[in-house]
Amino acid sequence: MKKSFLAAAFTLGVTLQPAQGQDFTAAEAHARLGIEAAEGQYLGYASLCDLEARIRNVNLPKQRKPANAKQGERRPTNGYRPKPTHIPATQVFDNLWFLGTASTTTWLYGTEEGYVLIDGLTTDSQAQKYVIEGMEAAGLSPSAITAILVTHGHGDHYGGADYLAERLGVEILMSQKDWDLVATLGVHPRFGAPPRTGGIVEDGDVLRSGSSEMTIHLTPGHTPGTVSPIFKVHDGDNQHVAMLWGGTGFNFGPDVEIFQTYADSVQKMRGIAKASGVDVFLSGHPRRDGSVKLLAQLSSRTDDAAHPFVRGAGGYALFDVLEHCALAQAERFLTQSDKR
């Protein structure tokens, strides 16, 4: 392993080159391509190619209830965790709002005729602060939310969903496989209990709210039933097409088959995105896709300036990063398995 080259790539954004007389392994070759694709727009994803990273599995069934917690009681965020960086509710497009923190966001899609909330943030208190109070401060009506789409069954995306669903009287939507996943999870000390009931979305479903609609695409890998929606956004007279990659991290254990499934999902969505004319690429984690920086650029945008969130053809480098990093990790663990 040329560890010094990998370290340089992650800390400095340097393109990897093999030392004279040395060749990259298959894993290192994919990692190099993934890191190169991340340079510029997608540095937040480059760590996925770290071949020294510990790959944990957060999808395993487990009871994580604190010893002093009552059955079913939702627990507050751990005190030792730093407070998330606050970002005010921000209108990114005419029909798309950013609600959340620099760590985790929920995207509010639609108009006052009807909104779909994409993900539910991490806790009840975050949902209250960033969704309910954030919308009200921006002059929006939380009561116009008609559904909560949870992209995948991890607590940082469903943590506040139950609270919002109960308060607003709306349904939580997930894929069947991720409903099955959350049914195996216990009460998390930070995120609380996972949602237990709601609606099911399937591959190709069209979710409508008011005059807005989005198409749901099943992209397994991050979890068995991760979904990635595609929807139209408007910037004045200009229309664009956005895709939100529903699940990013490799926190499903050193499973070669799942890494390959992840890569297959990336290939699938690359084709769908091109056919749909996608030119806006979003994430539920702003530090991944650079949304924090883009929001700052948006705040100072002049009338004749390009929209910072519209990446155009260059945005498709995201798929190269995700695919090569997934294949790099697959090769890494396949090689380790062969050596046993």
What would you call each of these model-derived segments?
Residues 82-138, 229-250:
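Conserved beta-strand hairpin/beta-sheet module of binuclear metal-dependent hydrolase folds
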Residues 125, 153-159, 179-182, 224-227, ...:
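Active-site environment of divalent metal-dependent phosphoester hydrolases
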